[in-house]
């Protein structure tokens, strides 16, 4: 026995160096004040004590206030109050012995405003004392909802974008419905814009019909009475002679005169194909004179003068104004030769031109000079006659303008280069 006690003492001395092997003899530990009741030692310190159904003993003989062992976290820690477990419990009395040996569990309580006040974790109670008044604005009446954007059933885009087949078969009916439903605001910048297919309430334009525009009804599309008021008729098409030219030039002086040049493709612009694909039929049924008139109407709707139009089989880009040769793509349509009419020089308009000078301004795009030069010469004479009639007709329309003709920088540069080239050719001829 003695040897065993000595052996234990030796092991205890060796292991006593480490604090974890030292005997714990009622040492006092610093714990948070919210965990320690302010009444001193209570019966809850007993590990397996019996449950108590009354108020816990709040006094301990000779005990000191344990809340002073730790620095107070708030001034309220100095005051003695009732046990936290009994003040905030649902039944007003709760024994600490019913909890774990270490005291009440921390997950059951939430720390209150002060360190010694704990509150039970419970769903929030909404009352007039705990909830703040709402800061939301007054709910608008349902009458004001009509002033905002329309709801989804009222938007025609779902019907407008149903399928591509519907758009092809119905022509431009959906566009007219969309234009009528969503009209432009009066003050918006885009409300002043007009196009040949627009159908606004005050511009007097009609939607294009699928029918072919004939020569007889083309001039009567907009009937002008003695008072000068335009009366739109039912028959109209995208391009009709003297229709949009008279409307834009006589009744809309606000259209700016930019004086630029427009290169128009006869295959795509002059012959619009509708949804039924009868563009080739319309192309075959039209005479050259009617083509030039429709081209002039198309040109006049965009504010170009008669000598500022270039008609090509394709869109031609002029890179050098001093170069007399023009290049185009290898593609050419099969319905005859396409001629490029070079515009007349403003400096030499007063001097009369001979037939040779007019013929020298026509460039053949199709093929080099061949044996059918007589036919080409006949065709050129006919085109020049049509152009002269066209210029005489448009001159009366242009006489009603109250503003002068302006030219862009590119136009001035092109005319300067052309005049230099023609003067050089004249010097070579004289030499």
Curated annotation (Swiss-Prot):
Top-level taxon of the source organism: Eukaryota
TM regions (residue ranges): none
Basic and acidic residues bias (residue ranges): 412-425
Compositionally biased region (Polar residues): 42-55
Residue ranges, annotated region (Disordered): 31-55, 257-291, 365-431
Protein name: Uncharacterized protein At1g76660
Originating species: Arabidopsis thaliana
Lineage of the organism: Eukaryota, Viridiplantae, Streptophyta, Embryophyta, Tracheophyta
């Amino acid at each position: 026995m003695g040897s065993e006690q000595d052996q234990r003492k030796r092991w205890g001395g060796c292991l006593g160096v480490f604090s974890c092997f030292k005997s714990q003899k009622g040492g006092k530990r610093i714990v948070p004040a919210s965990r320690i009741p302010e009444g001193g030692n209570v019966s809850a310190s007993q590990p397996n004590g019996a449950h108590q159904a009354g108020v816990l003993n709040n006094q301990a003989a000779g005990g000191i206030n344990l809340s002073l062992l730790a620095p107070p976290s708030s001034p309220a820690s100095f005051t003695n109050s009732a046990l936290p477990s009994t003040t905030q419990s649902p039944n007003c009395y709760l024994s600490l012995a019913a909890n774990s040996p270490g005291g009440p569990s921390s997950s059951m309580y939430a720390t209150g405003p002060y360190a010694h006040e704990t509150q039970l974790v419970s769903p929030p109670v909404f009352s007039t004392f705990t909830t703040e008044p709402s800061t939301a604005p007054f709910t608008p009446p349902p009458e004001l909802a009509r002033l905002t954007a329309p709801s989804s059933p009222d938007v025609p885009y779902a019907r407008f974008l149903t399928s591509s087949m519907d758009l092809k078969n119905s022509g431009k009916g959906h566009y007219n419905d969309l234009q009528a439903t969503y009209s432009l605001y009066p003050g918006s910048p885009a409300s002043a814009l007009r196009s040949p297919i627009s159908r606004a309430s005050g511009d007097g334009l009609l939607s294009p019909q699928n029918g072919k525009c004939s020569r007889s009804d083309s001039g009567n599309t907009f009937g002008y009475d003695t008072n000068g008021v335009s009366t739109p008729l039912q028959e109209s098409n995208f391009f009709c002679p003297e229709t949009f030219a008279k409307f834009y030039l006589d009744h809309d002086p606000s259209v700016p005169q930019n004086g630029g040049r427009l290169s128009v493709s006869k295959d795509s612009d002059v012959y619009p194909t509708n949804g039924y694909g009868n563009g080739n039929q319309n192309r075959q049924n039209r005479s050259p004179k009617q083509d030039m008139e429709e081209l002039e109407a198309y040109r006049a709707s965009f504010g170009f003068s008669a000598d500022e139009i270039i008609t090509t089989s394709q869109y031609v880009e002029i890179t050098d104004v001093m170069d007399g040769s023009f290049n185009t793509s290898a593609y050419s349509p099969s319905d005859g030769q396409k001629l490029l009419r070079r515009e007349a020089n403003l400096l030499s308009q007063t001097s009369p031109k001979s037939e040779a000078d007019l013929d020298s301004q026509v460039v053949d795009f199709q093929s080099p000079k061949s044996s059918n030069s007589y036919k080409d010469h006949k065709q050129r004479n006919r085109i020049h006659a049509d152009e002269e009639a066209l210029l005489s007709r448009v001159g009366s329309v242009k006489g009603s303008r109250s503003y002068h003709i302006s030219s862009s920088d590119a136009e001035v540069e092109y005319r300067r280069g052309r005049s230099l080239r023609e003067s050089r050719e004249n010097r070579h001829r004289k030499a």
